[in-house]
UniProtKB/Swiss-Prot annotation:
PANTHER family noted in UniProt: T-CELL ACTIVATION INHIBITOR, MITOCHONDRIAL
InterPro entries for the chain: DUF4460, DUF4461, TCAIM
Source organism per UniProt: Homo sapiens (Human)
Residue ranges of coiled coil: 404-437
Function as written in the Swiss-Prot or TrEMBL entry: May regulate T-cell apoptosis.
UniProt-annotated location(s): Mitochondrion
Main location: mitochondrion
Protein known as: T-cell activation inhibitor, mitochondrial
Superkingdom to which the source organism belongs: Eukaryota
A Gene Ontology term for the protein's cellular component: mitochondrion
Amino acid sequence: MFCHLRPMRRLCLEKIFPHWFPFSRALSGAEAVNALRPFYFAVHPDFFGQHPVEREINENSLKRLSVYLENLQKPGFKSLKPTQLTFYVRETDQSSSDGQEPFSTSGFRAVKFTLHTRDLLSTVLYILNSCSLSVEHIQSLNTNMHTQPLKEAKRMPDRPIKWDKSYYSFTGFKDPDEDLEQVSRVETTLTSWLDNNGKSAVKKLKNSLPLRKELDRLKDELSHQLQLSDIRWQRSWGIAHRCSQLHSLSRLAQQNLETLKKAKGCTIIFTDRSGMSAVGHVMLGTMDVHHHWTKLFERLPSYFDLQRRLMILEDQISYLLGGIQVVYIEELQPVLTLEEYYSLLDVFYNRLLKSRILFHPRSLRGLQMILNSDRYAPSLHELGHFNIPTLCDPANLQWFILTKAQQARENMKRKEELKVIENELIQASTKKFSLEKLYKEPSISSIQMVDCCKRLLEQSLPYLHGMHLCISHFYSVMQDGDLCIPWNWKNGEAIK
């Protein structure tokens, strides 16, 4: 007698997008990706090269979103746990800050939302709406089955229907708000999350072990063959992806061994573009073909010459600024090529020469500074180094450095002390839990890592035995079995 109630279940989602349901249909995976193009364009990590922290957060959130979308398409799935995501959204032509955080001076804003949808269409609409992006283009995806224009659909009365809890109890239907309400009532704790995800992580880690051994073998062979200092990756690609990149480099070495040996003593980094980095690492763009890589290795002697000139330029700037050391901190600065960084230094050096500001020789020895192209006022970082804008006023710069020099020395001393404590706690945590590996994402500070490890050591966590544990900003089981936990994980009372 209640058969007529089943179609009414879908009306619960009208609370979010009531005008779409008269003409909606199930989206395919390809259609969903196409519909999300404006979103991907607004959050793609490649557009955040000048902002490494925001870039990393977007990368991680995109991975979790991808898993969510994949699970939605699996046959027979019942329900998904609410997934909380954070994205930094670039200002685009169709972006609007209505109801959202305002854009920063860098041209992006942080958007946080929780996915608790049950199908691809409502998920796509929810994401676009959360980021204040247009949904007009999605109408074309429904024209094969429905020809009613969007503007007519919008004329329908927007009356959200909220069913009483007794309706779901009586019919046995799933309350779409139940999981979300539960999340708001009960925060995820470390022990509960490990209980729910530990076995899955162990299985993934076990499956990845052969590839991990292959990765280590390839890395050791290439490092020895080319006499490299190290081989690294800019992004957190999976083990299979990394092995594929090393196999590609190995094949190139077989064809052009003498050319590749020009990288002797260097660190090779697989990244988004080919060239030499600001600190002298050889960057191999993963989308480039062997021909581009070969040309890069052939040009290495000229890069080494530019690197020597860059070091001289850094020394000249240091001399003009009382002996302060010019450094480039990879974890905190945008990814720059050697040419880009040299140009930045050259502009700054010429401005200093023209201003003729005076510092007592060697009065600032032991201090450090980094150059930024997207700042307009100097600042002092908590780690003790100065953030100096390339185009800042030299007179203001002189006053700022002199007044903050003592505080900078104190910050640097605390940084060194904190680093020692951090390393000791990492070793202690690794030993106590018999971890195979304990590491952190670049955006996690030493203060956050110390706080995290101190609290971990107070726990009994048998699921961590033999695991790879990454301290991050969120909970996740990576594709190769690495466990990611937020640095401010909670067990009982919230950590503020």
